[in-house]
A protein has these predicted regions:
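The feature captures the beta-strand-to-loop junction immediately N-terminal to the Walker
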Residues: 36-38
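Catalytic Walker B motif of ABC-type/P-loop ATPase nucleotide-binding domains
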Residues: 151-155, 160
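ABC-family P-loop ATPase nucleotide-binding domains
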Residues: 83-138
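ABC transporter nucleotide-binding domain
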Residues: 167-256
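Conserved ABC transporter NBD signature motif
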Residues: 27, 58-74
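Helix-to-loop junction immediately C-terminal to a conserved catalytic motif
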Residues: 51
Length: 300
């Protein structure tokens, strides 16, 4: 299995502020990787380092077999879509398509026109007059027209309503299917339910550090929620890694990374979903920043 992204001890400082610290992650090719964490966790910083838009303070980063760099050969392989949707509001989608053809050697203008026609998005209206969901679709179609091998998406659906998000993610998964295994995606978002629908890999950041990285199904299988009486849990803690614990007067609830079978009959073990896993590693609702990850998702 080839690797699309690999970092070792990657760090980035802005004067006295550490934006990313000791970041070591691996993302195989042909994956949709969820990049998740509260505001200020370092998600945008990591994406910019992967895209070659920023230089690391320390550590190493390897993207598609080489170091990110600002040269045409590397940039042709990378699609980067910023959260603010970088479109010229007075230009039409057709204007953007023609400009892209002059700037990108592998430009696929037909794919943009086809995707936008399928979505009933007009080519000859100024993009500033389109809805937020339509602008996001135009930006994604233009980014995909580069035919990148790595697509970096920085919270592209943050301002969209649930239906527009669903359409956007549908376009993304269709592009993956059409790529023939030649596309890897890193999708940054606060919306855990959306990520759970389309992603098969995860990078979880908190406080500028990597908390979790790996295949989602594998990680879910390695974790359980254990619920039982409030008592000494030292035996459980020796057998398993306790990620998060909630104790009441009568009951203990543990999120654990399994170190083997659960032998204690007093505890009931249940599977975890992605939201439980993410919030467990981030300390559940311990800080206001974590509430973003549930409150926004409840809009669906």
């Amino acid at each position: 299995m080839n690797t699309a992204i690999e970092t070792q001890g990657l760090s980035k400082r802005y004067r006295r502020v550490t934006a990313l610290s000791d970041c070591s992650v691996t993302v195989p090719e042909n994956r949709i990787c969820a990049l998740i964490g509260p505001n200020g966790a370092g998600k945008t910083t990591l994406l910019r380092l992967l895209a070659g838009l920023s230089r690391p303070t320390g550590g190493t980063v390897c993207v598609l077999g080489g170091a990110p760099r600002q040269d045409p050969a590397f940039l042709a392989e990378i699609g980067y879509l910023a959260q603010e949707i970088p479109l010229y509001r007075r230009l039409t989608a057709e204007d953007h398509i023609r400009a892209g053809a002059h700037l990108n050697p592998r430009w696929d203008a037909l794919s943009v026109r086809t995707r936008l026609a399928d979505l009933n998005i007009p080519l000859n209206r100024a993009v500033g007059t389109l809805s937020g969901g339509q602008r996001a679709q135009v930006a994604l179609a233009l980014t995909l027209a580069k035919r990148p091998r790595l697509l970096l998406l920085d919270e592209p659906v943050a301002a969209l309503d649930p239906l527009a998000r669903r359409h956007f993610l549908g376009t993304l998964t269709a592009a993956m299917a059409d790529s023939g295994g030649e596309l890897t995606v890193v999708l940054s978002s606060h919306l855990i339910a959306d990520l759970e629908r389309v992603c098969d890999h995860i990078i979880l950041l908190a406080e500028s550090r990597v908390q979790l990285c790996g295949d989602i199904d594998t990680l879910l299988g390695e974790h359980k929620v254990l619920v039982g009486p409030r008592k000494n849990t030292s035996a459980l803690e020796r057998a398993h890694t306790v990620v998060h614990a909630v104790r009441t007067a009568r009951q203990t609830t543990l999120l654990v990374r399994l170190g083997g079978p659960v032998f204690d009959p007093a505890y009931e073990a249940s599977d975890v979903d992605l939201e439980e896993l993410v919030l467990g590693y981030m300390g559940a609702s311990a800080t206001p920043a974590l509430a973003q990850l549930t409150a926004i998702g409840e809009e669906q």
